[in-house]
Regions:
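Amphipathic alpha-helical linker/stalk segments
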Residues: 69-93, 123, 132-133, 138-142
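Amphipathic C-terminal alpha-helical segment
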Residues: 162-180, 195-204
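Amphipathic alpha-helical packing segments from all-alpha helical-bundle domains
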Residues: 121-147, 155-160, 183, 187-198
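Amphipathic alpha-helical segments used for helix-helix packing
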Residues: 103-125, 170-178
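N-terminal intrinsically disordered/low-complexity leader segments
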Residues: 1-16, 203-205
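Hydrophobic alpha-helical connector segments
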Residues: 80-108, 148, 157-161
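Alpha-helical DNA-contacting segments of helix-turn-helix folds
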Residues: 29, 63-71, 79, 112, ...
């Protein structure tokens, strides 16, 4: 085996180990939640040392961020698939798609918002931008529904609406004391969007 072949073999093994570590971390988060995730458990499941995990991702935060990036990508893919022909139906579709994703991937989505960097380090800019891009998907339909509003106000309203939808869904799925009953989440989300838009003066279709 020449040097090029040996290097290629090492690269393949490295990629396989990285993929395995990500999959194990994702599976553990999905089943038990982020707070139960331990680097030792990931390393043991992958039959490697803790040092190998750190070498691959820099630190444990690096592994969690990698899983969270993939979660945002999957969420955004689902949201962008919502038809955009009618802005009101699009907003309802975005809320419905978010509910579906949250119900199917509750712990993974929760991990995205629960994760705190070690030593209060700032989050990498790329994942912040990815999350903001997902939130911004409500911006385009709101612009169409509120054409006379200040663009900066509409951008802020889009973030506020997405935050409200996220909060309603998160509390509802966790069945918190003040939450909307899970069985009525879809119905009451639709009512919230209609009521909120009416308060903003958006036309009814």
């Amino acid at each position: 085996m020449n040097n090029v072949q040996e290097e290629s073999r090492r690269d393949r093994k490295k990629l396989q180990r990285r993929t395995l570590l990500i999959e194990i971390a994702r599976r553990l988060i999905a089943s038990k939640g982020l707070r139960s995730l331990k680097v030792r458990d990931v390393a043991e499941a992958a039959s490697c040392s803790i040092g190998s995990v750190y070498n691959e991702f820099g630190d444990f935060d690096g592994l969690i961020l990698t899983v969270n990036r993939e979660t945002v990508q999957a969420l955004t893919a689902g949201l962008t698939a919502v038809p955009a022909d009618d802005p009101l139906r699009q907003l309802h579709g975005l809320a419905d798609a978010y509910l579906g994703f949250a119900a199917e991937h509750a712990n993974l989505l929760r991990a995205l918002f629960e994760h705190r960097m070690e030593d209060d380090r700032p989050f990498p800019e790329d994942i912040l931008a990815m999350v903001m891009d997902a939130f911004a998907l409500m911006h385009a339909p709101l612009v169409r529904l509120l054409p006379d509003r200040d663009p900066d106000d509409v951008a802020l309203l889009a973030r506020m609406m997405f935050s409200a939808v996220h909060g309603i869904i998160s509390l509802g799925l966790e069945e918190r004391m003040v939450a909307v009953p899970p069985a009525r989440l879809r119905e009451l989300l639709a009512q919230f969007i209609d009521t909120h838009l009416a308060g903003l003066g958006a036309p009814r279709s």
